[in-house]
UniProtKB/Swiss-Prot annotation:
SUPFAM superfamilies: Preprotein translocase SecY subunit. Gene3D superfamilies: SecY subunit domain. GO terms for cellular component: cell envelope Sec protein transport complex; membrane raft; plasma membrane. HAMAP family: SecY. InterPro entries: SecY, SecY/SEC61-alpha, SecY_CS, SecY_dom_sf. It comes from the Bacteria. This is Protein translocase subunit SecY. It is found in: Cell membrane; Membrane raft. It is a multi-pass membrane protein. Component of the Sec protein translocase complex. Heterotrimer consisting of SecY, SecE and SecG subunits. The heterotrimers can form oligomers, although 1 heterotrimer is thought to be able to translocate proteins. Interacts with the ribosome. Interacts with SecDF, and other proteins may be involved. Interacts with SecA. Interacts with FloT. The central subunit of the protein translocation channel SecYEG. Consists of two halves formed by TMs 1-5 and 6-10. These two domains form a lateral gate at the front which open onto the bilayer between TMs 2 and 7, and are clamped together by SecE at the back. The channel is closed by both a pore ring composed of hydrophobic SecY resides and a short helix (helix 2A) on the extracellular side of the membrane which forms a plug. The plug probably moves laterally to allow the channel to open. The ring and the pore may move independently. PROSITE patterns: SECY_1, SECY_2. It comes from Bacillus subtilis (strain 168).
Length: 431
């Protein structure tokens, strides 16, 4: 691993991308401690025992706990992305048309997603400031009034817009997917606090049951290792489809056709489905927390909690649904079949064109079924282990966070390796 990192740092353009990404993350961490005006964050910190608060705070790298300018994190952007991508499925004809226009269409959709993020962010900021103020018995907002709420909402929306821009800069000039890297950084920054909470609850003042607590922590370590191995396995697994190129094409050797393969990942969506599933579960619980405690809000808090049987079932269903959805966003069977036909390639025994598209679609459906089930299992595995061991809520959140951290780290390393291989290939061709 250290040798790989050393190889990355020897290449100037990759080194510059890594340094740029780290600088952007430093800016993100600084912003997490810049307070919003007219807010008494200590009043909100008193409510930190709420599970949804801990989850939001973890994904924001502690920004919500400080009620900083980045308190909303990147959640509005994730929500906007989900909605816009769902609307592309023949719901809004214009979006469907743009989705088929290649790079030009993607730019239009990305721009519309930005605008929608600002609108959602402003609405969420108003609701969050008003709701959390009620939750803190009116102690959160100083000099509460319409103008105060508007100023706070504008500052929070500006913070989310800046994070969105920061993520795009990392994607364009740094390494990895910018939004995922920001979520990754937020989670990693909360790990020391989570470890401290586990140590405090399991080992401080528990000398008479020390062995039992050691066993509990050992179970947690086993769950962590299982998640790491599981994520690596599911991210690396591919199905190779045999491809034959006809004689006389640019890919065929002088003596005739060439055989190769088309690799399809078992889980082409990565950990994006988990991020989206968590964001989907957070939203109703966050809204419910604004309205105090009653039968309805209790029902929402319980049934949208992924440690509750109903919430866990919803969580698993969302992961499977988003895995299928994103598999076909990342892999377009129609475009693949068309490209193969243009290049003179075909799957042995399958006619080029529509039949090839149907074969790729069929294989992708089967692969995604396996990938989605496996992803769902390794997502809930830490929850079972942690509940069985009786560890604190922060550890349960840490299980989901770990899945995202490992997945993002793996994808980023693969991207860096591909850039290194590409650069070495270019150097070889020049020589």
């Amino acid at each position: 691993m250290f040798k790989t990192i050393s190889n990355f740092m020897r290449v100037s353009d990759i080194r510059n991308k890594i340094i740029f990404t780290l600088l952007m993350l430093i800016v993100f961490r600084i912003g997490a401690f810049i307070p919003v005006p007219y807010v008494n964050a200590e009043a909100l910190q008193a409510q930190s025992q709420m599970g949804v608060f801990d989850l939001l705070n973890t994904f924001g790298g502690g920004a919500l706990y400080q009620f900083s300018i980045f308190a909303m994190g990147i959640t509005p952007y994730i929500t906007a992305s989900i909605i816009i991508q769902l609307l592309q499925m023949d719901v809004v004809p214009k979006f469907t048309e743009w989705s088929k226009q290649g790079e030009v269409g993607r730019r239009k959709l990305a721009q519309f997603t930005r605008y929608f993020t600002i609108v959602l962010g402003f609405i969420q900021a108003l609701g969050m400031s008003y709701g959390f103020n009620n939750l803190a018995n009116g102690m959160l907002i100083e000099k509460s009034g319409v103008s105060t709420y508007l100023i706070i909402a504008l500052v929070l929306t500006g913070g989310t817009a800046f994070l969105m821009w920061l993520g795009e800069q990392i994607t364009s000039h740094g390494v990895g997917n910018g939004i995922s890297i920001i979520i990754f950084a937020g989670i990693v920054s909360s790990i020391p606090k989570t470890i401290g909470q586990i140590y405090e609850t399991q080992f401080v003042g528990s000398n008479d049951q020390l062995f039992i607590h050691i066993v509990k922590v050992a179970l947690l370590v086993i769950a962590i290792l299982a998640v790491i191995v599981g994520v690596i396995f599911i991210q690396q697994a591919v199905r190779k489809i045999a491809i034959q190129y006809a004689k006389g094409t640019g890919r065929s050797p002088a003596g005739g056709g060439q055989s190769t393969h088309l690799p399809l990942k078992v889980n082409p969506a990565g950990v994006i489905p988990v991020i989206f599933a968590v964001a989907f579960l957070i939203t109703p619980r966050t809204i419910a927390s604004f309205f105090g405690t009653n039968d309805v809000t209790k029902w929402i808090q319980n049934n949208f909690d992924n440690t509750h049987p109903v919430g866990m079932a919803i969580y698993v269903a969302l992961i499977i649904a988003f895995t299928y959805f994103y598999a076909f966003v990342q892999v377009n069977p129609e475009q693949m079949a068309d490209n193969l036909k243009k290049q003179g390639g075909y799957i042995p025994g399958v006619r080029p064109g529509k039949m090839t598209q149907d074969r790729i679609t069929s294989i992708l459906y089967r692969l995604t079924f396996v990938g989605s089930i496996f992803l769902a299992v390794i997502s809930i595995l830490p929850i079972f282990f942690i509940q069985f061991a009786g560890l604190p809520q922060s550890a349960q959140i840490g299980g989901t966070s770990l899945l995202i951290v490992v997945g993002v780290a793996l994808e980023t390393m693969k991207q860096l390796e591909s850039q290194l291989v590409k650069r070495n290939y270019r150097g070889f061709m020049k020589n």
